[in-house]
């Protein structure tokens, strides 16, 4: 009987330990400088990266923040799959399957033609761009590197955003601030 009670105590202790450990284990790595990869700590040094209220941060706008957490979930479940599958899935969920992620601002008429077919025009394009840019910086933050194709897509996203920079000119100086931030993000992206 003593042996049975001892075994029962040991098993219940181990079980309690596993339950406590599982509850204290975070599902997501919070976007804070100290939690980033070594490369992210070197490259993503500006405070805006870690400000959840900064709408021009890759993780501060709603779409960018959602992309980070959705990518964390996807990565956990699809660790051996190409990240293009994640991005295609997000574009389908957003209502733009097959959007050409390589299209940039070098052909303004073609891009404007595509944007004109979108339900919410530039707002939808901006959301697509935010998904791509957030994914690139999510990879840098979590993995310490940005896949070559993701980097190309993000560079194209910045190029598309530059075409619509005047959208952000509602307040004096806002457009210039946005352009300065985009230049910094693009520079940091290229270091990743």
What do these predicted ranges mean?
Residues 80-81, 143-147:
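Charged, low-complexity interaction regions
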Residues 21-74:
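N-terminal leader/targeting peptides and immediately adjacent processing regions
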Residues 73-100:
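Amphipathic, membrane-active segments
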Residues 1-23:
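Bacterial Sec-dependent N-terminal signal peptides
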Residues 91-123:
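Acidic, Ser/Thr- and Gly/Pro-rich intrinsically disordered linkers and low-complexity segments
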Residues 126-143:
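Amphipathic alpha-helical elements of HEAT/ARM-like alpha-solenoid repeat scaffolds that form extended
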Residues 158-192:
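Eukaryote-biased recognition of C-terminal alpha-helical segments
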């Amino acid at each position: 009987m003593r042996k049975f009670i001892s075994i029962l105590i040991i098993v219940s202790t181990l079980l309690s330990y596993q339950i406590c450990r599982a509850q204290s284990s975070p599902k997501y790595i919070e976007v804070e400088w100290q939690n980033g990869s070594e490369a992210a700590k070197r490259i993503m040094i500006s405070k805006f990266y870690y400000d959840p209220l900064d709408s021009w941060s890759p993780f501060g706008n709603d779409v960018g923040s959602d992309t980070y957490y959705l990518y964390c979930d996807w990565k956990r479940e699809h660790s051996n799959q190409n990240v293009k599958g994640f991005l295609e899935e997000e574009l389908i969920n957003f209502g733009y399957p097959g959007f050409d992620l390589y299209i940039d601002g070098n052909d303004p008429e073609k891009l404007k033609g595509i944007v004109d077919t979108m339900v919410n025009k530039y707002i939808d394009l901006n959301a697509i761009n935010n998904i791509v840019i957030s994914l690139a910086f999510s990879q840098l933050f979590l993995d310490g590197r940005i896949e070559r194709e993701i980097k190309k897509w993000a560079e194209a996203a910045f190029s598309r955003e530059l075409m619509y920079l005047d959208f952000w000119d509602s307040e004096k100086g806002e457009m210039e601030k946005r352009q300065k931030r985009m230049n910094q993000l693009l520079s940091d992206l290229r270091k990743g």
